[in-house]
């Protein structure tokens, strides 16, 4: 008897239970444009609260680290800014005792332009906001050709001086040369790039076949730090930074 009442209760609960299905009756949406017009109506209390943080950020981002002749922008298949960043990868390699044959920097990792004139550390962070670190990999010539095919399929990435690719408008590789020479399939090529790409991301899966992979130890190996150091060195030498579009990647048909 003592088990009967709980059992009856369970039966009644099951009998009363109904399964409901839910369907979307309507959808409403609107687009909210977030731009600087909100800055005109920031409450005074919020301004006062944020002021000390803003001063701290400004103290870090406002120092001038470099100088450019004009605005450097990103564009495919080749651009001044992507050329510069790929060249900086090669330059940095020599600072770490490496002798890279070429450098690669992805267009997707370039998030802003470098302004004309004075360049601040904040400008560099805008260009390279991620914690990507410089790395060095060895690829065979055959794997390097695969890498160039993948770059062509993506419409172009940043490649260093000496690389000459001819591609079609629909992303096929026609020819590839390095320092005026054809790529030797059995040769070994040292590539400087960020660790994100060296892991085979952004469709550059040829990097998965890399050997002798190295990320330098210690602080200051992030891309933005290396870019900053290059800009500082050029500024100290009195050289405003520029980088021409010189046919590193050409669409020929």
Enumerate the predicted regions with their spans.
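Feature captures C-terminal
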Residues: 18-35, 84-86, 90-92, 98-103, ...
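Hard-cation-handling environments
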Residues: 31-33, 37-113
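Positively charged n-region of N-terminal signal peptides that target proteins for export
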Residues: 1-4
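C-terminal motif of bacterial Sec signal peptides marking the signal peptidase cleavage site
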Residues: 12-15
């Amino acid at each position: 008897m003592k088990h009967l009442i709980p059992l009856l209760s369970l039966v009644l609960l099951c009998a009363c239970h109904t399964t409901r299905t839910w369907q979307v009756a309507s959808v409403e949406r609107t687009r909210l444009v977030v731009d600087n017009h909100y800055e005109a109506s920031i409450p005074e209390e919020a301004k006062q609260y944020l002021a000390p943080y803003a001063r701290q950020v400004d103290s870090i981002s406002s120092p001038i680290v470099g100088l450019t002749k004009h605005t450097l922008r990103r564009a495919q298949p080749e651009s001044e800014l992507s050329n510069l960043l790929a060249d900086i990868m090669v330059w940095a390699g020599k600072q770490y005792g490496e002798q890279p044959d070429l450098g690669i920097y992805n267009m997707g990792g370039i998030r802003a332009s470098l302004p004309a004139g004075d360049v601040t550390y904040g400008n560099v962070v805008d260009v390279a906001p991620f914690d990507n670190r410089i790395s060095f990999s060895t690829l065979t010539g055959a794997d390097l050709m695969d890498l160039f095919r993948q770059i062509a399929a993506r419409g172009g990435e940043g490649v260093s001086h000496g690389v000459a690719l001819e591609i079609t408008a629909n992303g096929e590789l026609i020819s590839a040369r390095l320092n005026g020479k054809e790529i030797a399939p059995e040769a070994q090529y040292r590539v400087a790039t960020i660790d994100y790409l060296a892991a085979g991301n952004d469709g550059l899966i040829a990097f998965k076949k890399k050997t002798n992979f190295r990320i330098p130890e210690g602080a200051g190996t992030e891309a933005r730090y290396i870019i900053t150091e290059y800009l500082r060195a050029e500024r100290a030498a009195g050289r405003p930074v520029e980088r021409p579009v010189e046919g590193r990647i050409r669409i020929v048909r």
